């Protein structure tokens, strides 16, 4: 993020992965539930270096940052569960609450 702390980012992603597994398990047990994951912006302009290694091969990763601020990079939106198909495509952030509201009707 703003500190350009690649080690911290990796640790946060591990924590996020653990949390996401718990949430997906919950959705699987409660099929009326929708899980939506997104961000309001990207920060840091993170780039991962490429050295031509095979997929699955463990190699050191070289992360670089273009800024300590926000970027204009499009952020993903992931949806899982009841109504997830409504999140196919590209959305402006302000459109997402309307999609969720429509699903709640």
Report each predicted region and the residues it spans.
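A post-motif C-terminal structural segment
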Residues: 1-105
């Amino acid at each position: 993020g703003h500190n350009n702390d690649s080690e911290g980012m990796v640790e946060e992603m591990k924590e996020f992965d653990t949390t996401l597994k718990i949430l997906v398990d919950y959705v699987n047990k409660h099929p009326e539930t929708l899980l939506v994951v997104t961000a309001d912006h990207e920060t840091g302009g993170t780039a991962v270096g490429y050295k031509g290694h095979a997929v699955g091969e463990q190699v050191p990763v070289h992360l670089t940052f273009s800024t300590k601020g926000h970027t204009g990079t499009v952020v993903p939106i992931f949806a899982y569960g009841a109504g997830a198909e409504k999140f196919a495509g590209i959305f402006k952030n302000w459109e997402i609450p309307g999609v969720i509201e429509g699903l709640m009707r």
